[in-house]
Amino acid sequence: MEKLNTHQIEELLFFEKNSDEQIIKPMIDMLEQQISYMIPEMRYKLALKDHNRLSQIAHSLKSSALQLGLKKVADICLTLETEGRRNTEFAFEPLIFDLQIELRESITELSIYLKKTKQIAS
């Protein structure tokens, strides 16, 4: 499975190119800030068995991931969101761990993709 939705990223690049504002970097920075508190918050809500709140956090993170074209991250978040809404016993912790790793890998891959795209455009 592809980590990135390159079509979404290309749309962001197009929008950024046609405006005087930097768009993608602030979005990545914001996502990294979200990660710093959302992942621990997910674990905390899991410990409290507050699956509904865990689902809400996953939904919010999924939205940010989709905006940046982080397809695999969004898929993991969707699973967490769906299972959290079901409020059943589910192996949340391994998936939260996978999410944390996938976020780092996908952000790195996005950065590489952006550098390659800018080199081609030059």
Regions found by a protein language model. Name each.
Residues M1-Q56, S60-K62, L66-S122:
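Two-component system phosphorelay core
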